[in-house]
């Protein structure tokens, strides 16, 4: 999560980049204006400032569109039904505060005591999705101020879904949060809990999740072939924690060891000098740590402990082919990066060595969170930091860096593009946006990259997320000059792209209130935009842009029928779907055309000719069928 300074509101560029104006105004061929009316947007985040003008009713400024808020931190109020912690507040209480019926009767409702999410994140996210100047300005909001524990996030999802079910309304839930600490194949205890909650209401419920901001952090190591000759890389920090996904067939065939080096570390220059080896563990396998945790004390020449290496392997999760394996190094250093000058004494360098057969994937867990006094880093060039040169060095990279829950199969994963590279303040002075590196419309290079360990493309779709100006609480105490009473802030990240997508989904659910996640995903991915920037990383779909850029007007105005078993008023039957070999079409038609989701014509067949999909790669395709009554379309999924 990245934060910027207060500036004037300039959200209109996100609306322009996502082509939402035509949907909000009902421009032809759209049958009416769609604004998110009667749709609920769930914001599971740091909370929301209920007094902000962005969340009022556009026709009555005394009315608030926030139906309820569950603060999981607050134990002063009434607990919500079905949950044993936190406090719940309601629309009437918010309106009483807004209109002066009560005064300061409620606690601050956009608040995170851990500082992990900062202050204002939830309000900003909610403004993008459902503010009066946001994507769905008439949607209602249910917010959760979450404690960041995985189980609490799942509880928050259930809270929103339960409320929407009781009210009989469709809902889209925004998750601008996540973690790298998982198997990256969509399995695990939390993934299963998440799946069970989402499946409680399959119709009219969609979850959008941010792909994460680790796309240029070099946090992934692995996915290369192993042999009896060791390969190695370097890490340093306090602590160093690597999470591995290792196939169940390889947990006794891959071995690891750790080498320690000590010397002088310059935090400001990020370099080591005078390094000497001070410790080396024995080789150990993940299987050997299933029953008994591995622990090794790395000692300096004087006998003092320099670092403690620990390793543990969990049992295989149901539905996964991988084991969750962790190597953690407690460097025993004296660090506090919150003070000035920063204190980073006793930092050592560690080399992770690996040999065996097959492949593995691993992720360096980041601890450089807002308010944290620690850090962890990978090494892409040993010579740049003063590390020993080795011929078997393998640098970490940026693939496989999408976070959970975005990589869960029950979500739509959202990456970020550049919304603006500069802005004008209230005096008309132009400033470069804080994180701007690339032109408007190009990829936000921090966006987490795919694929997943089980081979799925990530992210799935991209929306504006770098340098977005939107709502912030009036009590926000961040850096920068406050304008408009301090109620707008510039932020960057996939956290900002995700609510743009969630707001777009709210417009879709207003039109199709019983649409399923699969139907929503298919329509959005089949109607993305491809341009000169998406071409930078090859043909779509790919693991940088997914299926392309969000264009909600294209989705609403030209969306493809989502009854794929029949086309054109039940005149043409198409089966099977998904298909692996021959596709059957029954009925009176003249011609079939197969298109990629980017609109490229791939094949043409006349009636009576066999349409074989056996040679097509797995993925989504568009089938257009010419009949005497007209031309109709359907989505076809190829799955071998």
Residue spans of the language-model regions?
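Surface-exposed, proline-anchored Ser/Thr-rich loop/turn motifs
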Residues: 563-587, 595-601, 618-620, 637-640
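C-terminal subdomain of the subtilisin-like protease fold in secreted/lumenal serine endopeptidases
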Residues: 166-186, 204-213, 217-220, 224, ...
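Short, surface-exposed loop/turn motifs with a glycine/proline- and acidic-biased composition
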Residues: 606-633, 639
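Autoinhibitory propeptides
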Residues: 1-40, 47-62, 421
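Catalytic-core environment of secreted peptidases
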Residues: 87-116, 313-318, 383, 417-427, ...
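Hydrolase catalytic cores
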Residues: 126-130, 142-154, 158-171, 230-232, ...
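Active-site core segment of subtilase-fold serine proteases
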Residues: 48-123, 267-378, 382
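Active-site alpha-helical elements of protease catalytic centers
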Residues: 83-142, 151-156, 405, 489-509
């Amino acid at each position: 999560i990245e934060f910027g300074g207060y500036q004037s509101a300039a959200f209109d560029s996100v609306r322009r980049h996502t082509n939402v104006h035509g949907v909000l105004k009902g421009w032809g061929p759209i049958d009416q204006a769609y604004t998110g009316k009667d749709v609920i947007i769930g914001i599971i985040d740091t909370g929301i400032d209920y007094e902000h003008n962005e969340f009022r009713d556009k026709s009555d400024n005394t009315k608030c569109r926030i139906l309820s808020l569950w603060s999981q931190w607050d134990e002063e109020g009434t607990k919500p039904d079905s949950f044993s912690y936190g406090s719940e507040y309601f629309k009437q209480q918010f309106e009483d505060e807004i209109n002066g019926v009560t005064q300061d009767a409620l606690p601050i409702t956009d608040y995170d005591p851990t500082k992990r999410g900062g202050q204002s994140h939830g309000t900003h996210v909610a403004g993008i999705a459902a503010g009066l100047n946001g994507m769905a300005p008439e949607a209602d909001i249910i917010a959760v101020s979450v404690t960041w524990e995985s189980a609490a996030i799942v509880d928050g999802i259930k809270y929103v879904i339960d409320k929407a079910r009781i009210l009989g309304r469709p809902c889209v839930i925004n998750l601008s949060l996540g973690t790298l600490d998982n198997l990256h194949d969509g399995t695990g205890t939390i993934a299963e809990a998440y799946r069970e909650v989402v499946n409680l209401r399959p119709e009219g419920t969609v979850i959008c999740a941010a792909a994460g901001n680790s796309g240029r952090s070099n946090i992934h190591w692995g996915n290369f072939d192993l042999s009896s000759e060791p390969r190695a890389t370097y890490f340093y920090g306090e602590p160093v924690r690597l999470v591995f996904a290792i196939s169940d067939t390889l947990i006794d065939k891959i071995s690891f060891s750790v080498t320690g080096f000590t010397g002088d570390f310059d935090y400001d220059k990020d370099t080591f000098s005078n390094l000497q080896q001070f410790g080396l563990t024995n080789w150990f396998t993940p299987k050997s740590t299933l029953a008994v945790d591995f622990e090794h004390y790395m000692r300096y020449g004087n006998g003092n402990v320099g670092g403690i290496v620990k390793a543990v392997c969990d049992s295989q999760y149901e539905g996964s082919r991988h084991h969750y394996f962790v190597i953690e190094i407690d460097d025993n250093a004296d660090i506090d990066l919150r003070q000035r000058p920063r204190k980073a004494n006793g930092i050592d360098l560690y080399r992770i060595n690996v040999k065996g057969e097959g492949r593995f994937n691993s992720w360096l867990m980041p601890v450089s969170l807002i308010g944290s006094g620690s850090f962890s880093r990978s090494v892409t060039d040993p010579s740049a930091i003063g590390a020993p040169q080795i011929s078997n060095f393998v640098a970490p990279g940026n693939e496989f860096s999408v976070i959970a829950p975005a990589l869960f199969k029950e979500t739509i994963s959202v990456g970020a593009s550049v919304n603006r590279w500069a802005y004008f303040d209230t005096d008309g002075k132009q400033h470069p946006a804080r994180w701007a590196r690339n032109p408007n419309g190009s990829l936000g290079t921090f966006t987490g990259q795919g694929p997943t360990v089980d081979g799925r493309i990530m992210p799935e779709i991209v929306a504006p997320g770098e340098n977005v100006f939107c709502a912030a609480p009036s009590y926000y105490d961040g850096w920068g000059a406050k304008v408009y009473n301090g109620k707008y802030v510039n932020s960057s990240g996939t956290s900002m792209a995700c609510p743009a997508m969630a707001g777009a989904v709210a417009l879709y659910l207003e039109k199709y209130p019983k649409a399923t996640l699969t139907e929503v995903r298919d329509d959005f991915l089949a109607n993305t935009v491809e341009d000169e920037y998406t071409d930078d990383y090859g043909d779509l779909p790919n693991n940088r842009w997914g299926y392309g850029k969000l264009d909600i007007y294209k989705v609403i105005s030209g969306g493809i029928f989502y009854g794929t078993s029949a086309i054109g008023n039940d005149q043409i039957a198409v089966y099977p779907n998904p298909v692996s070999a021959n596709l059957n079409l029954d009925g009176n038609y003249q011609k079939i055309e197969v298109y990629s989701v980017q609109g490229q014509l791939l094949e043409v067949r006349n009636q009576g000719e066999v349409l074989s999909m056996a040679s097509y790669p797995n993925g989504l395709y568009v089938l257009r069928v010419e009949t005497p009554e007209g031309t109709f379309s359907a989505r076809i999924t190829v799955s071998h």
